[in-house]
Amino acid sequence: MSEARKLFIKTYGCQMNVYDSERMAEALGAKGYVLTEVAEEADMVLLNTCHIREKAAEKVYSDLGRLRPLKTAKPDLKIGVAGCVAQAEGEEILKRMPLVDLVVGPQSYHRLPDMLERTEGGARVVDTDFPEEDKFDHLPERKATRGPAAFLTVQEGCDKFCAFCVVPYTRGAEVSRPFARLMAEARGLVERGVREITLLGQNVNAWSNDGRGLGGLIRELARIDGLERLRYTTSHPNDMADDLIEAHGAEPKLMPYLHLPVQSGSDRILKAMNRKHTAEHYLRLIERIRAARPDILLTSDFIVGFPGETEADFEATLDLIRAVGFGSAFSFKYSARPGTPAAEKPELPAEVCDARLQRLQALVTEQQRAAQMAMVGREVGVLYEKAGRLPGQMVGKSDHLHAVHVEDKAGQVGDLVRVRITASAPNSLAGERLGA
């Protein structure tokens, strides 16, 4: 029996890419590949890339450059680039990096085994088409899970065309996976020990199928015996339907956590971004969501230094942050992406963007620390995902997605326990198990 070939995957960017990497590993597993965490051991190295920011894209080329010595030492090593950089740059990757054997876009990775077979004869292959067929129809059934929490992609693509964003160009139009297939995949995950599922999509709350929206899907998933927790990400304010907001109050298995990007608090900048909503619309949404689920923790995304942003625009963003009170937020300086409308506009001075980002992050950090301190003394559910670094310690995620360290010598990965929070650190909480 021949020795199994080894596959190393490096994943960049969003949770969608984490899910895609798992599915690519499963597709190649059907061809005899097993995962390794050591690139030097691999027979194939696959970089699953992100194109949302310029630095993310350039990091891929830097990492490819670091693979040159390995390719020289192992000429039969196959190197592939997948994901959104692959979709955006295609043939250009082969021109810039002769060591790359194949380039596969996010809508084509079900064809990865066939592409790899073609490289065995020396061909260099690019497949960045948007096929008519559903790629999920051609992928093997999910058989492996890496813990009690799993991702499930329910929707791909985006039709919003925000002026700064490449997603509509790299991931295509919004497509919702069929309800029946999602239910079957979720049941399969639970049968393999998964207790928490996070529903994924570039614009996940745009999902619709068979007359259901995302709220209806969540209600049906919650009926699966053994599935204890549900989450979803990432959402657009314009697709927060009444049914979905109601689900936050009505469905106990839907965790009290919501990531709802707003990007700016200035209506003028929101219009320039083509966000199709106002700051007031966002604030009213937050009121309704909190009315449905008062204990919900909210997080968001912000871009500072968007072309044309004035000091007054930036102050409006700070005002919105103060008005909402976020548990955390991802914040970035504007990064022009080729092919997007905003890339044609003059950029702000770097020093202005740097100063604004520091001010925004200081405010968000203050809110994050306050939110975590407010958890001290409260009882929360924690799903253990791994053993801690200290003996007898377990680490898991709370209902609000905080990392929690618990002293629990009898604890096992997959246990869902009640914990009293005893202390707050900058990026995590500590607690004691109740009823042990």
Curated annotation (Swiss-Prot):
Catalytic reaction annotation: N(6)-dimethylallyladenosine(37) in tRNA + (sulfur carrier)-SH + AH2 + 2 S-adenosyl-L-methionine = 2-methylsulfanyl-N(6)-dimethylallyladenosine(37) in tRNA + (sulfur carrier)-H + 5'-deoxyadenosine + L-methionine + A + S-adenosyl-L-homocysteine + 2 H(+)
Q: Where in the cell is it found?
A: Cytoplasm
For [4Fe-4S] cluster 1, which residues are the binding ones? C14, C50, C84
Query: Which residues are involved in binding [4Fe-4S] cluster 2?
Result: C158, C162, C165
Q: Is 4Fe-4S among the key words of this record?
A: yes
Q: What positions belong to coiled-coil segments?
A: none
Q: Which residues form the MTTase N-terminal domain?
A: 5-121
Query: Residue limits of the Radical SAM core domain?
Result: 144-374
> Where primarily located?
cytoplasm
Q: Which GO terms describe its cellular component?
A: cytosol
Example of a GO MF term? metal ion binding
The record's EC number reads 2.8.4.3
Q: Quote the subunit structure annotation.
A: Monomer.
UniProt lists the family membership as follows:
Belongs to the methylthiotransferase family. MiaB subfamily.
Name of the protein described by the UniProt record? tRNA-2-methylthio-N(6)-dimethylallyladenosine synthase
According to its UniProt entry, this protein's organism is Cereibacter sphaeroides (strain ATCC 17023 / DSM 158 / JCM 6121 / CCUG 31486 / LMG 2827 / NBRC 12203 / NCIMB 8253 / ATH 2.4.1.) (Rhodobacter sphaeroides)
Taxonomy of the source species: Bacteria, Pseudomonadati, Pseudomonadota, Alphaproteobacteria, Rhodobacterales
